[in-house]
A protein has these predicted regions:
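Structural signal for interior beta-strand "rungs" in well-ordered beta-sheet cores
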Residues: 1-14, 18-181, 186-187
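A glycine/serine/threonine-rich, flexible loop-to-helix segment
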Residues: 191-202
Length: 203
């Protein structure tokens, strides 16, 4: 089902039922409003809903039942796993891998090459419930990695190449090249075997 003025690039594979351009609150009841913009070679699997005013680059892929809210911008060669939720007003870079059942809240910034494991929860409200102007999602800098089922508190910055161990609860910034582990997480030096320096996206 399509709403709004959508623009989908060449060679897109869209497996119904998919909803493109669903109206945000300000456009409910309107028939004339912006849709989504999706680049070439996209694969969008059944059950997914992408709201209006979302911009997605080339070679995007998503699993089933993915929700992407309004005014989110996603770069090239990025994938989002099954049943993940990306709330509005967020930015996601190139070559990002978001695994299944991840929650990305409003006002989150995810840079190029980031990897987010399954079941990760990012948060944006330190003392809920807070009004929208106060919501501040995490900032995940280039090539940072988050292990499965970790929780990242509002406004936390993961530096370039930083890593978060599975199941950790991150309550303070993680410097570039460091690892956070535990609940609450403590910052340590990166193990010698380390994660990768960059993510090599498939052609």
């Amino acid at each position: 089902m399509h709403y709004g003025k959508n623009r989908v690039g060449k060679n897109a594979q869209i497996y119904d039922p998919v909803t493109l351009g669903f109206p945000s609150r300000e456009y409910l009841g309107s028939k004339d409003f912006p849709g989504v913009i999706i680049g070439d070679d996209a694969v969008i699997r059944s059950g997914s809903i992408i709201y209006c005013e979302v911009i997605i680059g080339h070679r995007f892929q998503c699993g089933h039942n993915v929700l992407i809210r309004e005014k989110t911008v996603i770069g090239n060669n990025t994938s989002v796993g099954t049943a993940s939720v990306i709330e509005g007003y967020s930015s996601i870079g190139n070559n990002v891998r978001i695994q299944s059942m991840v929650f990305v809240p409003t006002n989150t910034q995810i840079a190029d090459g980031v990897f987010i494991g399954p079941g990760v929860v990012l948060t944006n409200d330190r003392y809920p419930p807070t009004g929208k102007p106060e919501l501040k999602g995490p900032v995940l800098e280039e090539n940072s990695v988050i292990g499965a089922k970790a929780v990242i508190l509002p406004g936390i910055i993961l530096g370039k190449g930083a890593a978060v161990a599975a199941g950790s609860v991150v309550t303070r910034d993680v410097p570039a090249g460091k690892m956070a582990i535990g609940s609450p997480a403590k910052v340590r030096d990166m193990p010698k075997e380390k994660v990768r320096d960059t993510y090599d996206a498939p052609e």
